[in-house]
Amino acid sequence: SCAGGLSGISHIPVTRLEAKGEKLTVKISGLMGGHSGAEIDKNRANANSLLGKFLHGLDAKAGYELISVQGGQKDNAITRESIAELLTVKENVEAVKEYAASMQAAWREEYAGTDEGITVTVTEEGEQDVKVLHPTSKEKVVFFLVNVPYGVQKMSGTIKGLVETSTNIGILKTSENEVLGSSSIRSSVETARDALSDKIEYLTEFLGGEYE
């Protein structure tokens, strides 16, 4: 049966703390993007997925607090640009910039021939008093971004070259008390589509969130 697609929306609740430090905006941009149905098999990067990898890897390089993550307008478009607002101490600013440069180089190599314009920029916003995510909330958000599936999950066993099942984390938004992620889940097989939706639901609920 032809099942088509569905949107799975994850709501991850967050709590905040007052903090003071150097505010940085990290922007991942320059991606090819495309339609999550037509272009999902072309090995293009999704900026929201890259942002998750960036934030997780950064923890080992420089301590930081997370303020917000955002990226994408439509869940059926491969996200071309994603932004994280961070707070760190002055001594760590250079380390964040160095890490951004190294990730940009690594991703351009990883996506050679398919997404070579990936750019990672760090903008200094100066010293600010802001409400950052509680460390537990930050970890949940980063864990969600690293683990929410993206891309081709299965090729068709009967039609050569046809994508059977895929998913795209196309929208990321942060408000005062939640981070929202919206995925476009597609499959020509209804049970496979539902299983993939269930997987994202399980991830969301495990992190204390709600899924619709």
Map each language-model feature to its residues.
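Redox- and metal-dependent alpha/beta enzyme cores, enriched for Fe-S-associated oxidoreductases
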Residues: 191-210
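Midchain, well-structured core segments that form catalytic/ion-binding scaffolds
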Residues: 1-186
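Short secondary-structure junctions
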Residues: 64-66, 208-212
